[in-house]
A protein has these predicted regions:
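Interfacial/gating helices of multi-pass transporter permease domains
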Residues: 10-15, 51-59, 79-101, 129-132, ...
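Helix-terminus/linker motif at the lipid-water interface of multi-pass membrane proteins
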Residues: 2-7, 71-102, 120-121, 157-167, ...
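Helix-loop junctions and terminal segments of transmembrane helices
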Residues: 36-41, 96, 100-138, 142, ...
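Short helix-kink/termination motifs in transmembrane helices of multi-pass secondary transporters
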Residues: 60, 64, 68-80, 84, ...
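Membrane-proximal transmembrane or re-entrant/amphipathic helices at the cytosolic face
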Residues: 257-258, 281-338
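Short runs within selected transmembrane alpha-helices of multi-pass transporters and secretion channels
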Residues: 1, 13-29, 66, 70, ...
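Interhelical loop/hinge segments that connect adjacent transmembrane helices in multipass membrane
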Residues: 10-13, 28-74, 117-132, 249-267
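Alpha-helical transmembrane segments of multi-pass membrane transport and lipid-handling proteins
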Residues: 131-185, 215-224, 273-278, 282
Length: 338
């Protein structure tokens, strides 16, 4: 990045990225050979192994469809924003998504590391433990997602005002839609991990329908309401497929239990997030008088105060009213004591 910045030649940056990619692959392969000498790959054995494990190709094809649909969902919005507004609006929109996407990626990378553990847990077949860990992971995702959207709702506009200027701030409705989509993307992780753990990829109609709904709704609504209409596409499609269908699919084919308990606990999470949001807003508006858009120091102070107030209230409410966050807390305390 420093080379690209000072030389203004991105070919250098691409060359370095490519070279380090090859170097990393070589070092990684050598480390794998040292750590797992029994794990060897041979292209010549490919056809034989495919015959022995036919499910591998079947699952790969199904997973490929899911990944393509996810790509369509995540990459089409900027083009549609440009189609129904202007290049200037795309730049403004990109400023927001640059912040939300990077933070979402960081959170998902941290929480996504539990995926392999979920697969092992499912393989063990302990139904009670499977459900307990499911709600632990779900509760921590909703807790973190609540902090994420609350913080960005109050902090992203003053930050952009400091960073670029107040004329780069977009309508509040656009911010709400961006955060709603980000919230779904963060909270969907546990369902996806368990679907992968059970090997449930055969609902290939779902990602195709999700992509089709996203494009059609974004195009239709975008022609009427511009950027807000475009953002309605992923919001509606993810609500129908990710929030409604995928839990039904997991509970029916994976857990093989009633879905009513899921909706009941989930409604409790939403009620807690809403209550924590209202209480936090009332508290910090009554005690905070600083303007976060006046300087970076005041913005950092404002961010620490508002985020801390919400985090404390949200954790207390979730700890009191949900079993998942209590189990997760006990697990973390045990690990720390060890």
């Amino acid at each position: 990045m420093c080379l690209a910045y000072y030389t203004k030649n991105y070919y250098y940056w691409i060359t370095i990225e490519l070279a380090f990619g090859f170097l990393f692959s070589i070092v990684l392969n050598k480390k794998i050979d040292q750590t797992y000498p029994w794990l060897s790959t041979n292209i010549k054995k490919g056809k034989l192994l495919f015959k022995q494990y036919p499910d591998v190709m079947k699952y790969t094809k199904q997973l490929f469809v899911h990944k393509i649909a996810t790509f369509v969902l995540s990459q089409t919005s900027p083009f549609l924003v440009f189609a129904f507004s202007s290049l200037k609006s795309v730049a403004f929109y990109s400023n927001y998504t640059l912040i939300t996407d990077k933070l979402s990626g960081l959170i998902n990378n941290i929480l996504g590391s539990t995926g392999a553990g979920v697969g092992n847990l499912v393989a063990e077949g302990d139904e009670k433990k499977i459900k307990q860990v499911f709600w632990e992971l779900t509760s921590i995702r909703y807790f973190i997602a609540g902090i994420f959207i609350f913080s960005l709702y109050h902090l992203i506009e003053p930050f952009i005002s400091l960073w670029l200027g107040s004329n780069y701030i977009m309508d509040k409705s656009i911010l709400i839609l961006i955060l709603a989509n980000s919230f779904i993307m963060q909270t969907r992780g546990t369902i996806d991990q368990y679907l992968y753990g059970y090997g449930l990829f055969n609902d290939i109609w779902a990602p195709l329908t999700e992509a089709a709904l996203n494009l059609s709704i974004a195009i239709i609504c975008g022609s009427f309401w511009g950027i807000e209409g475009v953002l309605m596409g992923p919001l509606v499609s993810m609500t129908l497929i990710v929030c409604i269908w995928k839990p039904c699919f997991l509970y029916n084919k994976g857990f093989k239990t009633s879905l009513w308990s899921y909706w009941l606990i989930l409604s409790k999470y939403f009620l807690i997030i809403t209550s924590a949001w209202i209480l936090s807003t009332l508290i910090f508006k009554s005690i905070i008088t600083i303007n976060p858009a006046s300087s970076y120091k005041l913005w950092i102070l404002y961010a620490l105060i508002t985020t801390s107030i919400y985090s404390i209230i949200s954790f207390i409410l979730m700890y009191i009213f949900t079993q998942g966050i209590r189990d997760f807390s006990y697990r973390m305390i045990k690990k720390i004591r060890r």
